[in-house]
Amino acid sequence: MKGMKEYIKKLEEGSDLSSEEAEAAIGEILSTAEDEEIGAFLLALRAKGEKPQEIAGFVRGMKQAGNTIKPVTPFRVIDTCGTGGDGLNTINVSTAAAIVTAAAGVPVAKHGNRAATSMSGSSDVLEALGIKVDLTPGQVRKTIEKIGIGFMFAPVFHPAMKRVAGVRKKLGVRTVFNILGPLTNPAGAKGQVVGVFDKKLCEPIAYALAELGTEHALVVHGDGMDEISNTGETFVAELKDGEVSTYTITPEAMGMLRAKPEDIKGGTPKENARDLLCIFKGQKGPKRDLVILNAAAALYVSGIVGSIRQAIPIAEDAIDSGKVMVKFNQFRNFTAELSIQGKKEGSCPGEAFLASSDTSVLSPASGEKA
């Protein structure tokens, strides 16, 4: 069996690792490898460039080393997650889009972490909104099944990642770990919208997702953002039915006005939380349009509509009808109850809240409760 030294040598020679070798390497990195070996491996891989089978192997290895859940849901579970690192400091688009998507009836297993390069990460803004993010895996599964949305806080689900934190900080450059987060969804989401900080990553990540068994995914880079953009063109690598295709979309093609970058700027977690609440309550403008575009993409990969454009009215209605605020309040209240009382083994302390609330999932495709 090969070890880290062999993997490092192979990478330094410019050769690609097989998916199995990549999986074994990440297993060593997250367990027994020395810091010097980890640093050399990451730098050699960065110099060579990551290939789809390597990315897929790393993802498998990370999932093996972490915690996973299998929520039972009426529809395909989806995730909206970006790599971050675009340096544009927008509002928390994928987090807002996740709540809108859940309000439209699609179960969401949102994966995220604290801010690394921006002022506000997904967990930061959720905490500012009063949502508990440090739930156990079992509690998150209950939240997805009962409410239709759950947040999987990366340190809870990938505790072994703390082994590489020091090395990554010391290296001071982007490594493969900067792109693995959105791909290691602990709930095994089969539909994904993945935002990336570099257009060149779109196709390799789409092919990696294909190898990992993802059913439908959009890997996007929009006008410098790790989101679908309403300020310019968005490059998309779409994985569907095992095939990857690429194309570009514009705000105008989606029936939306083109915005200016300053119109969608974010701020601190509290400032972004305020912006998200305004959007949820129906305030119109470029920030709402940006959230709707990305929620529509999530609805598309869920399989309930045939295109992003077809999903836009569904996302708009979820906000304007008040469903989004209802879903947000359910999410906040249920996670609060679980956080306070959920340590009792085998109990589901949110049942009292559920009994007094209409939390049934409404299918936008049929209008029937499921």
Swiss-Prot record:
GO terms for cellular component: cytosol. Anthranilate 1 binds at residues 82, 113. Pfam families: Glycos_trans_3N (PF02885), Glycos_transf_3 (PF00591). Gene3D superfamilies: Nucleoside phosphorylase/phosphoribosyltransferase catalytic domain, Transferase, Pyrimidine Nucleoside Phosphorylase, Chain C. It catalyses: N-(5-phospho-beta-D-ribosyl)anthranilate + diphosphate = 5-phospho-alpha-D-ribose 1-diphosphate + anthranilate. Belongs to the anthranilate phosphoribosyltransferase family. Homodimer. This is Anthranilate phosphoribosyltransferase.
